Amino acid sequence: RELHRLGFLDIASRRGVTVADYAQTGSLETLRAIMDFHGGLPDAKTAGSILQLRYYLEGPAMEELAARHTPADMAALQALQRQAEQAAQEGTDALAEALFRYHRGITFLSGNTITPLLFNAFTRVNLEFWKEYIQLTGIDRCLERLAQFTAHIEAGEGQAASSLLRQG
């Protein structure tokens, strides 16, 4: 019953039990079960899908925030940027956490109440992504990118911020 509830099995009367296509029948709980099985992290294909989902969620949030931000929203975003700059001096782990908070902050400040919860659901995956991103890109480039995001959002250039997000 538990495997059926998680979307791994189909149970049909008179036909019995068959293996289900969990991508079609599963839920967020299914994904968490798969990640737990793999030590809390997704395989490469699933990680790519999660990253793609992030683009789908954060890009529109950037556009929305750029279109309707208040001075308080910009102050909050700039504070998150400063926290990232300070965290960069502490090392990769601290910067990864700050980058996560900055990007989750964008979704929150956009007015969406669900997207930040989805970001929280994938905190561990996000932190691993950010650590790898920092190592590949470098701290200075990460901070430069944050400054660009903040500037585009403040200028009302949501499409530019969203495009920058996709560029990495």
Summary of predicted features, one role per range:
Residues T137-D140:
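Short helix-capping and inter-helix turn/linker motifs at the boundaries of alpha-helical repeat units
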Residues I50-E132, C142-Q148, A160-G168:
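Conserved amphipathic alpha-helical segments that form helical-bundle/coiled-coil interaction surfaces
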Residues R1-Y56:
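Short linear motifs at protein or domain termini
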